């Protein structure tokens, strides 16, 4: 799954930007695998005290008390029939589940949520063979655990197969989960309906009763009944279509490969497609609503290239004969990797050359790469439980880097990947962060696992490990992992084992070391000679939260190293700092270079302190080469002064990514109280001469964030001086920008960012040019093609007049491009009129003109503006109950609404307001980890201002 708001730029600044066989032995495998994959809990007894068991909806004792299902009944195969009615907006369905019993039991527990089960029967394998009718089963329901119990008349016999049949029905959902309805508007203004599924993590149970846990893999044979004006899609290719009385059609699909329930998918719609074939013969089709089929060309081209790449890289063929990618008009995540039928937000799949920018193209490519990687990581090999979702999400995020670099090098995603790591450091440097692997039991807890820690940090530690082991060894290890656990489930240790043993016999040196390099220290060579230590090292990154700080002190040719836990908002002088440092120790694969040589040196820091000897005297040393390591570096003594001097004298002696890393680390260290703000600001002087777009964008992002912080707090003297400094020092590079779509991807993204900043700061030439283009666009009735990279800027300037704002809202409703709609919606959110902002929020809640899927990002964008911050916060408090009717408590949307409307606060009054609101929610039984994250973030903001405001004021007075 790809989670990201369609309107939140992934450069840590909230903006509207688009930025998510093998059938042999199947009869034998289930019996072989039961012992290794499933075990009966030791506490599993049927004679427990009745008082210990929950009560079903009919008042009877429910025979199971755990959130996790018992493993005494294993599903092998589902026959599923579904008939959705897109007029009455409901569906009827039936299923027959083949199960294998491992222990005697008188009940079968499975998941079901909001389904009306009208009939349930049980047949033994022998009864089925002789066509004997099934025996009626009593159904008990326990909604608190989303479980049902099927009570059997006599105990089921171990090692025998049975068939459970059920008839059921339900309404198509109004939200974004289970089997739900979506709508779209045609070019002619007609509203049409489709029915679509989204099951991850625990919503398959809303569409059919099932064993809805990733460990319960099975095969699925699906039949869908529909009207002739619609098509039906599912995971597998269609085998045949049967014509029924009354004009209905019934599509039968091939039986799936063995897979988890959350990957099942089916859709009934009237979409059109564009298709092509990979070099290995897989048919790839891109589906979209009929009027948007012309926006599917790029997605098809990218999908074909990426699928070919993955088959070669993983040395495993994609196991299905087709792969469909479909753009869903109403879809909560960025995308979902259902095997063979990947569902996307329109903004994550469709590309319109007239309205999609360079960053839009990068976004679409990334999300396609992410979901296609899941066809191996997640689908072919699945985590045993949701506590380890990083095994699929971290890998898919990491494979974006590998795959996009290989297939579209011109997109220069290698440079962009730094942001993936920088984004998560913001959260991981708070005490409220969590380990990558963390227990999660309830549906809400499971949903909360879909966050930056699983995705971004997971990807970053994999990239660090790849850099450490070497690309070839790392690739061999993951191929071994995928082949060993195909169609099975895996856990962390299985991955480390595969990566530890990825050295082939021919790879070893005479000394028994799998990788040899003269720049490695002796402890690095020793480590690589002891492959088992991969697990020992990596568990320090997956089982403890946070990020390490490497403190470096140079003394002649000697380097003294010390590691600490890096914490934002908690300073060394604070009483709690020392306690928060205890028991934290990482095995850090260090890299460093010096002013004397381009050689990259390597060393593993496994202790709190260590000493390194340099081969020669050097004026500076730079750790974390290319920012491949997941750690912050602080240079004590004159270390920072020497690096800043080098940047000012000749910044090109430091590698481009190292310059980005230095800018990032220096400002992060200010937030941790380890450096004064003036030291970090002094570093920005050199940016006048910087030609690398990533470094320029990194520096500008911090300066711009300070400006917005002052603007929201109405600290006008500082905000005006910051504006003056930005326009004074960056005017040459701003004035060099053309209002066009020319240049490399990074040239274009820099242009968008610089011109947006200039117009935000009311730079007269920028405002004048944007207003001129907007007037021409209005006069052309929206037909003028404005360069896509400046489209959002032009719309934002135009939205500042009532006539412009109203016209944009009209165009938003008429537009057939989701990319353009995102840019318009961002522009509308920049209005300084609160009644207009409130209208946008109301339209988002209603969900017709502005789809509810965009509400979280809309609130986030409005809250960042001085005129919108209180409005958005008040709206959330007053409409919390209504918001929970639209989004699940643990959903990404709810978490984004909470953080997006509160995390920018920086006063004690606001901290108290937010704290009281969270306490009131917890009193009602609603608890989320994001509550503590937000409170810590606001506290961090308060402390940042207290510590740095006088310095910022003084520095600006001297430098403007």
From Swiss-Prot:
Keywords: Adaptive immunity, Aminopeptidase, Disulfide bond, Endoplasmic reticulum, Glycoprotein, Hydrolase, Immunity, Membrane, Metal-binding, Metalloprotease, Protease, Signal-anchor, Transmembrane, Transmembrane helix, Zinc. Residues 41-960 are lumenal. The active site is at 371 (proton acceptor). N-glycosylated. Binds 1 zinc ion per subunit. It is a single-pass type II membrane protein. It is found in: Endoplasmic reticulum membrane. Its cofactor is Zn(2+). Induction: By IFNG/IFN-gamma. Its EC number is 3.4.11.-. Residues 1-20 are cytoplasmic. Zn(2+) binds at residues 370, 374, 393. GO terms for molecular function: aminopeptidase activity; endopeptidase activity; metalloaminopeptidase activity; metallopeptidase activity; peptide binding; zinc ion binding. GO terms for cellular component: cytoplasm; endoplasmic reticulum lumen; endoplasmic reticulum membrane; extracellular space; membrane. GO terms for biological process: adaptive immune response; antigen processing and presentation of endogenous peptide antigen via MHC class I; antigen processing and presentation of peptide antigen via MHC class I; peptide catabolic process; proteolysis; regulation of blood pressure. Substrate binds at residues 200, 334-338. Disulfide bonds join 421-460, 759-766. InterPro entries: Aminopeptidase_N-like_N, Aminopeptidase_N-like_N_sf, ERAP1-like_C_dom, M1_APN-typ, Peptidase_M1, Peptidase_M1_aminopeptidases, Peptidase_M1_dom, Peptidase_M4/M1_CTD_sf. The record marks 455 as: Transition state stabilizer. Heterodimer with ERAP1. Aminopeptidase that plays a central role in peptide trimming, a step required for the generation of most HLA class I-binding peptides. Peptide trimming is essential to customize longer precursor peptides to fit them to the correct length required for presentation on MHC class I molecules. Preferentially hydrolyzes the basic residues Arg and Lys. Defects in the expression of this gene may cause improper antigen processing, possibly leading to favor tumor escape from the immune surveillance. This is Endoplasmic reticulum aminopeptidase 2. It comes from Homo sapiens.
